[in-house]
Amino acid sequence: MKTRIAINGFGRIGRNLFRLLLNHPSIEVIVINDIADKKTMAHLVKYDSIHGVLPSTVSDDEKGILVDGKHFLFFHEKSISNLDWKSLDIDYVVESTGKHKTFEELNAHIIAGAKKVILSAPSEVDTIKTVVLGVNDSILDGTETIISNASCTTNNAAPMIKVINELCGIEQAYITTIHSYTTDQSLHDQPHKDLRRARGASQSIVPTTTGAAKALTKIFPEFDGKIGGCGIRVPVPDGSLTDITFNVKRAVTINEINAAFKIAAETNLKGILDYTEDPIVSVDVIGNKNSCIFDAQLTSVIDKMVKVVGWYDNEIGYSSRIIDLILLTKK
């Protein structure tokens, strides 16, 4: 019997997750909830400016949307309390609105009848476990009803931190995410609480903050106070990278670092960490389901200072980890 899920919030992550789950052998989407109208959302499922045209027939009716004749319910509820997940026998709700991050808000899905909730963002509270697959998923014991899948950048950076720490130990780290623009920004100048993000997304390189540094200390509590970071938004719609500079405990060579990443990509982090020695650019990682594509050409070392770079499709890579987290926790 397939695992039944609901997607609450049908933006970039919600729609990419939906596309990835079409024809999945063990997970099926039952219902979508979003305040936008069904006709528009059906169109955006079919036609995606980044990931292309879905090779399926997509339409809508009075109760939902259809893909190749398969029907998916579509609700328009603003309040989680108005959703009846129990009557639909929902196993998982993927909370991807970007609005609900507290325990009380997320637990409303459990009260509504869902068995588990996956949050597609870092949690704002310590009572919800934040997980990066391949790095700290051993903290899960099966009793959790709400789990945070962290952020796309956290999923990208954490495998690199893991490999470097196991290789030579870490004293401090600073991450810089060179990130594609997102729907949090506007095409033209618009008011925003972050005055840099108030500027047109397609016109400038935009220095900003990143929540990944804080989230990473939930993944690696031993590095609390030792990881900093910032974000640089750039005028591309998808495809990002994280540049991490480490102060390490012992001197290490470029060859040692690259060899460690190559081994990890082929063994314990396979499917999460990819490895390349090719001179790639951001467009080359679009569609890659790995959390991190390690760029061996960009590794550099000065004594005990190490710099590594990992690319990521901040949409598809992250959405793929949500699926993997469901598969892991439904066992």
Annotate each PLM feature.
Residues 155, 159, 207, 211-215, ...:
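Generic recognition of short, well-ordered alpha-helical interface segments
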Residues 143-144, 200-202, 239-243, 305-307:
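Short, solvent-exposed beta-strand edge segments and adjacent coil->beta transition regions
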Residues 166, 170-237:
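Acidic, glycine-rich segments within the central catalytic cores of soluble metabolic enzymes
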Residues 65, 131-133, 146, 188, ...:
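Short clusters of hydrophobic/aromatic residues that line enzyme substrate/ligand-binding pockets
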Residues 1-198, 300, 322-324:
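N-terminal Rossmann-like NAD(P) cofactor-binding subdomain of oxidoreductases
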Residues 150-151, 205-207, 247, 312:
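Hydrophobic alpha-helical scaffolding
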